[in-house]
A protein has these predicted regions:
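Membrane-interface helix termini and inter-helical loops of multi-pass transporters
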Residues: 86-98, 120-123, 186-198, 245
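Small-residue-mediated transmembrane helix hinge/kink sites in multi-pass secondary transporters
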Residues: 32, 86-90, 154, 215-216
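Loop-to-transmembrane alpha-helix entry segments
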Residues: 67-73, 91-106, 119, 220-228
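Hydrophobic alpha-helical transmembrane segments in multi-pass integral membrane proteins
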Residues: 43, 85-89, 140-147, 182, ...
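Small-residue-rich hydrophobic segments that form or flank transmembrane alpha-helices
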Residues: 5-72, 139, 147-204
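Transmembrane helix exit motif
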Residues: 56-65, 101-126, 215-216, 238-245
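Interfacial loop-to-transmembrane junctions
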Residues: 212-234
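Membrane-embedded helical hairpins/re-entrant loop segments and their flanking transmembrane helices
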Residues: 108-168
Length: 245
């Protein structure tokens, strides 16, 4: 049990640091490793709670930059995706095959992020289907694997590419809203137990410390460097999930 708690502290600390410094990444980093110890459902619920805590910590500093205009359709679509993922997770969340699917999805995201960083997409190309489709994807994969933030980041980069403070603030407010919604659904369904409370109590300390440290580096360290390191970790974790789950 002691080693399990130390493991959670370490990976959550790294994930929260990445989230604080670059705006996203906690879900990717932690979900790449936590399923080695817990089921996918248990891992997802923990990471969703950590995401909500991290987002709230970051928002305390950046709340003045929140501007939800342009995100309403995205958020509504995300809620729809969260409802769908809730039924999938509660039905298949304890199956080991879901860990393999998670590994494949993580590697796919890493490849997508690598090539997407080389492209420069204009906001003028966005139509109404973009926030709806990205919102549903964010909601579904965020609720299923707690790693849907990539779709949120892509959309917010379109909207706030010239203002990194507004970008990170709006990513966090949407993350807080959608994560809290998923946790509410699972809470009503009775999916939490005492072990969850123990893991959360230990991990939330790492969340706060990691997010605060990440925010300090937010102004100094290139976000691209932090994301690159995080993506390498996620790539290795995804391969491990496929090969050894």
């Amino acid at each position: 049990m002691l080693w399990e708690l130390l493991f959670i502290v370490l990976i959550v600390l790294v994930g929260a640091f990445v989230q604080g410094a670059s705006g996203f990444g906690l879900g990717l980093v932690v979900m790449g490793f936590l399923p080695f110890m817990l089921s996918v459902q248990e891992s997802t619920l923990l990471v969703l709670s950590f995401l909500a805590a991290t987002a709230l910590t970051i928002l305390i500093k950046n709340y003045r930059s929140v501007q939800l205009k342009g995100l309403i359709m995205f958020v509504v679509a995300s809620f729809a995706g969260r409802i769908l993922s809730f039924f999938v997770l509660t039905t298949y969340g304890d199956m080991d095959i879901l860990k393999t699917w998670l590994g494949v999805f993580l590697i796919t995201l890493v490849v997508y992020l690598y090539f997407n960083n080389k492209r420069n997409v204009s906001l003028k190309k966005i139509n109404k289907l973009v926030p709806i489709s990205l919102g549903v994807l964010n909601g579904f994969f965020g609720g299923l694997f707690a790693v849907g933030g990539t779709f949120l980041v892509v959309y917010c980069l379109y909207l706030y590419k010239e203002d990194k403070h507004r970008y990170t603030a709006n990513v966090q407010i949407v993350t807080l809203m959608t994560s809290s919604f998923s946790l509410l659904l699972h809470g009503v369904n009775g999916d939490f137990d005492l072990s969850f409370l123990l893991y959360f109590a230990v991990g939330v300390v790492s969340v706060i410390v990691g997010a605060v440290l990440g925010l300090r580096w937010f102004e100094k360290l290139p976000a691209s460097m932090i994301r690159t390191i995080a993506m390498l970790l996620v790539l290795l974790a995804g391969l491990n999930l496929i090969l050894f789950s």
